[in-house]
C-alpha cells in the first residue's frame, strides 16, 4: 500500500491508478481513493500484470512496482521527460545498456555483460538505453501499447518491453536525477521478482 500512497500524493495528480494483483484477495491497507482501480487475478502474471489492463489506455502511461517509494514530483518529472522527447521515447529511472557485438543469448550473459543504470544512483544525462525497468517507466500512448499477449515468459517484463520498443522503433532514455531521488521500501528479498529470476 505504501507505493500506491506515494503515487496518489503527487504534485501532478494522476487521473487513474490501475493496480493488478496476482491474487484473489484485495491487499490490506490500500487507501480508499476513487482513482484507484484494483484488478484481482486467479492467474499469477508476475510483473507482466502491469500490462494486463492497459488496452485502450490514452495519454501518459507510467508503470510502477510495489516496492518503490516514488518521490512527490515523480509523475511531474516523468511527464516532463516524455514531453522533452516529443512523446516519441520511453523514459525511465532504471535501465541497462547491452554490449555491442554478438547477440546476448543466455541469461548469464545478460546479467554479467549489461551496464546497469540503477534508480537510486545519481544520473546526469538522458542516456540512451536498450532496456528500461518497468517499475520506473513512462511514455505516451501515441507510441502504442505493449500487449501482455506478446509476453510469453514471466519475470522478464523489462525484456519484453525492450523487444516491443525495438520492433516499433521506439527509443529509450534514462532521466537525469539526484542520488536517492527514488528509494526502495524494505521487503523480504525472496518476495522480489528480480530475486525469483536467479
Residue ranges of predicted features:
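Catalytic phosphate/metal-binding cores of nucleic-acid and nucleotide-processing enzymes, i.e., regions
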Residues: 1-3, 24, 52, 82-85, ...
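Active-site-proximal specificity loops/subdomain of glycosyltransferases
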Residues: 18-59
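Conserved catalytic core of nucleotide-sugar-dependent glycosyltransferases
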Residues: 69-149
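C-terminal catalytic/acceptor-binding lobe
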Residues: 141, 146-198
